Amino acid sequence: SMAYITKRGNSYSVRYTYQDEHGKSYDKWESFPTKEEATNRKKQIEHELAAGTFLIPSTVTVGEFLMDWLPKQCSKHKWAPKTYQSNLALIQNLIIPYIGEMQMQKLRPYHIEALYDTLSKTPCGQYVGGKRRDLSPKQQKRTLSGTTLHEVHQLLHNSFLLAVEWGI
């Protein structure tokens, strides 16, 4: 089993695939500020995977989990490209900027409530392609619709049900 290093912006990511106790495969990304740290981690992962001593990371973040979940859902339900894109946009623009760095294990219902509360006051188009935009005072008055908030709710509900199944 191999691990790969990718430069992402100012950091280096180690990408690898591991299997849980049920033989299910997961892709995992871990980020490091330097190439040296990433290289050391890559060697460690490959050694552990080969030796069978690899411990399944329980530090999966909301962002990592959702970006792992999305393509799997897409192929499972044979989504149209448009469905995939709209779900990706929800994740990148309305979820990751707010709770993406949180560990799944530490996420509690009140974090989700706080997210909905924040989103209900968030202007449309505050994030596009996962990047924050400067909005004019007029644009800032247009908040997200109830429909959009409901879509975020559905997506989180469906994906988190799966997280329970996956034992995250």
Predicted segments with their positions:
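A short, charged, amphipathic alpha-helix used as a generic interaction element across diverse proteins
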Residues: 33-49
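Short, Lys/Arg-enriched alpha-helical recognition elements, typified by the DNA-recognition helix
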Residues: 58-164
